Amino acid sequence: MSEQVIIFDTTLRDGEQALQASLSVKEKLQIAFALERMGVDVMEVGFPVSSPGDFESVQTIARNIKNSRVCGLTRCVEKDIDVAAEALRVAEAFRIHTFIATSPMHIATKLRSTLDEVIERAIYMIKRARNYTDDVEFSCEDAGRTPIPDLCRVVEAAINAGARTINIPDTVGYTMPHEFGNIISSLYQHVPNIDKAIISVHTHDDLGLAVGNAMAAVHAGARQVEGTLNGIGERAGNCSLEEVIMAIKTRHNILNVHTNINHQEIYRTSQLVSQICNMPIPANKAVVGANAFAHSSGIHQDGVLKNRENYEIMTPESIGLKEVQLNLTSRSGRAAVKHRMEEMGYQDSDYNLDDLYSAFLKLADKKGQVFDYDLEALAFINRQQEEPEFYHLDYFSVQSGSSVMATASVKLICGEETQSEAATGNGPVDAVYQAINRITGYQVSLVKYQLTAKGQGRDALGQVDIVADYQGRRFHGVGLATDIVESSAQAMVNVLNNIKRAQQVEKEIQRLQQHNNQQQNDSKQQNSQETV
């Protein structure tokens, strides 16, 4: 029977340290509810003594969370522990997490103390925390650089004092997985009362080894892993909990452990943390990145279409994603193009695959990623990306400020005509988009907006990538300019041209259908006359 690995989330404490601005109480509570839905066992939600704002957020979360244990961090300082207990006492169940440094460097240069004094202080503070709760966690800060005999002394004393969870942090992300695994194994071998506590690990990613170290520790017997969603945290970040959780699930055959996480909530929670913290998830991020289940290579796409397990060790559905994504690029094969056309409802007889694939490769070489409406245009109206576009941005101006409603004037070249309109909006970009909608008559709604800086300093360009919805279909647009409002306008004009092309495709398909229907009717009439 497999053992449980406790998932200890510190997104709202250690993760928040990476943010340029602190989260509001409302934002923290929103993330806490998402973590609760995901099923984290323990959530560390702040450092109550650090500020009145942190105290308030810890207390608010403690009052509202019912199914996860709420934890507050403290130093080995009396006031820290007392304040944390005051903030947490409204919780259904809470934990006090106290820590002190144990490495020779930290003891000598930061604490200006001795190991014996550190142990004495830890014992006193653990006992003080036990006056408030039976659930006390103790951390040996910088355990990764603490000699193992010293670490064993500290851990044994902490357990005797009443700590029920002993956390072993690799505070500076220094250790290698085999070293870290050996530390955990050594504790099990040399600490006589180790069976009275759960061994936890808290790893940092300074050398890119946080998840590797955590997994080595689990393999060696650790039964709690601390980390954050998306690996956010100071410096290079923390251990990515979603990666640990899915590694445990995927490699259950060798680890023989499990978590109580609701895996279906992983993707949604990851996206929420990214949005609230304003920290975009890299496309190549394991498990939750945009490319984690996307396949661009023709060989890989063909293999996935035949059997997903050929190139997927876990399914997108297992983290709450609906389907695998095949990105159509110049590396995609004929099978992927044909599959995408079938997904859109087209049969082999509706188009010429040889001609379509040839045109697709030319467009993919120029454009990069090819979307559904591009394929349809190539298949039915033979429109290439380099042909003249119908809409062009001729002119725009924006007036906005803290005390005035944003107003935009926009002039578009629409084929051979020039049209202009003005509109107000919720900010300059929205005002421009409202004016564009008035000109075209399209009711286009923005689904996704992403701004990326290209270059540095005064010469930097702003690239805007958007996804917009029009009559239930998604269209992509890209704009690039030194002015982000201009690049936003260009991106929307790009969307409009894609919509225009899609409309031409629909007309051409209707024409072909009418032509085919007419041919069938003519054939029936001819057969009827011959019979007579």
Curated annotation (Swiss-Prot):
Disulfide bonds: none annotated. Pfam families: HCS_D2, HMGL-like, LeuA_dimer. GO terms for molecular function: 2-isopropylmalate synthase activity; acetyl-CoA C-acetyltransferase activity; manganese ion binding. Pathway: Amino-acid biosynthesis; L-leucine biosynthesis; L-leucine from 3-methyl-2-oxobutanoate: step 1/4. Homodimer. It comes from Pectobacterium carotovorum subsp. carotovorum (strain PC1). Keywords: Amino-acid biosynthesis, Branched-chain amino acid biosynthesis, Cytoplasm, Leucine biosynthesis, Manganese, Metal-binding, Transferase. This is 2-isopropylmalate synthase. Residues 392-532 are annotated as: Regulatory domain. Residues 5-267 form the Pyruvate carboxyltransferase domain. It is an enzyme of class 2 (transferase).
